Curated annotation (Swiss-Prot):
Organism whose genome encodes this protein: Homo sapiens
Main location: membrane
Cell compartment(s), UniProt: Cell membrane
Extracellular side: 1-26, 77-100, 162-198, 260-272
Protein name: Olfactory receptor 10J3
Residues with attached carbohydrate: 5
Function of the molecule: Odorant receptor.
Disulphide-bonded residues: 98-190
Length: 329
């Protein structure tokens, strides 16, 4: 039912971490800022290495570079305002700024989903059809696949942002989160949001279930091909090229599915925040981990090993923070 005699909202306030004590907020600020800087530097290192080393000018590393760029933009869309909110918890955000944040969050988040799917297809072609790999995964095809992923992200984001901010927001202006998210914004609308929730669910299915299904099919075919390899060493190398990508896929789609595909009745504010904190800080560190071993068994360069060490540090920090967050919530 629409709410009558209400004033339309022009700005929102994030509830974020307002329930925590000030000393806890300062600890979170230091941890988040450190992880944020490590994330940015780690992605820049990866992009620089791929750009400078001509041996890495392959489809696999092209998509890795695109994923690093996308993850960097995704992180920049969320974390800076969250850090500001930890120091100034009562800082409002204008509806236009909230819409902008949601747009970039959705664009690059959805782009990440489809880039991971494309990377799975790349591994499928490399292992199941190696003789035609260079023909199928040519420069033009790689650019088209990367552009298609971004195009889908832009299209889905426009649909979602237009759907959400076409609603009236009256009286209620406190978002029970630390960034502008579709599910939490819909709760503040002073009108029926059934259609919007259906749109959100359909988009979530298209962005999560469909890519997950494609990745699953790719890996079924990949595993069946690997098992046919006579050499145990050959099987090991083939599995190694896919293991890190598969790990990232499970974490990425797993966290996103828990947040966006579960029924509204099972939505838990504390659980959503915990998963979102882990997701937004953990996922951006992962592109650097999707570095399959060279099929020829060559060792990574010193720069690549350094980048991986930085990522390991980031992942340990994220895991430690998540544990602390659970205990303090």
């Amino acid at each position: 039912m629409p709410k009558l005699n209400s004033t339309f909202v022009t700005e929102f306030l994030f509830e974020g971490f307002s329930s925590f004590r000030r000393q806890h907020k300062l600890v979170f600020f230091v941890v988040f800022l450190t992880l944020y800087l490590l994330t940015l530097s780690g992605n820049v290192i990866i992009m620089t290495i791929i750009r400078l080393d001509h041996h890495l000018h392959t489809p696999m590393y092209f998509f890795l570079c695109m994923l690093s760029i996308s993850e960097t933009c995704y992180t920049v869309a969320i974390i800076p305002h969250m850090l500001s909110g930890l120091l100034n918890p009562h800082q409002p955000i204008a509806t236009q700024s909230c819409a902008t944040q949601l747009f970039f969050y959705l664009t690059f988040g959805i782009n990440n989903c489809f880039l991971l799917t494309v990377m799975g297809y790349d591994r499928y072609v490399a292992i199941c059809n190696p003789l035609r790999y260079s023909v199928i995964m040519g420069k033009r095809a790689c650019i088209q696949l990367a552009s298609g992923s971004l195009g889908i992200g832009l299209g889905m984001a426009i649909v979602q942002v237009t759907s959400v901010f076409g609603l009236p927001f009256c009286d209620a202006f406190v978002i029970s989160h630390f960034f502008c998210d579709v599910r939490h914004l819909l709760k503040l609308a002073c009108t029926d949001t059934t259609v919007n929730e259906i749109i959100n669910f359909v988009v979530s299915v298209c962005v999560l279930v469909l890519p997950m299904g494609l990745v699953f099919i790719s890996y079924v075919l990949i595993i069946s091909t690997i098992l046919k390899i006579a050499s145990a060493e050959g099987q090991k190398k083939a599995f190694a090229t896919c293991a890190s990508h598969l790990t990232v896929v499970i974490i990425h789609y797993g966290c996103a599915s828990i947040i966006y595909l579960k029924p509204k009745s099972q939505s838990s504010l504390g659980q959503d925040r915990l998963i979102s904190v882990t997701y937004t800080h953990h996922s951006p560190t992962e592109p650097c981990c999707v570095q399959p071993e060279e099929q020829g068994g060559q060792r990574c360069s010193a720069q690549s090993r350094g980048a991986k060490n930085s990522v390991s540090l980031m992942k340990r920090g994220c895991e430690g923070f998540s544990f602390a967050f659970i205990n303090m919530y």
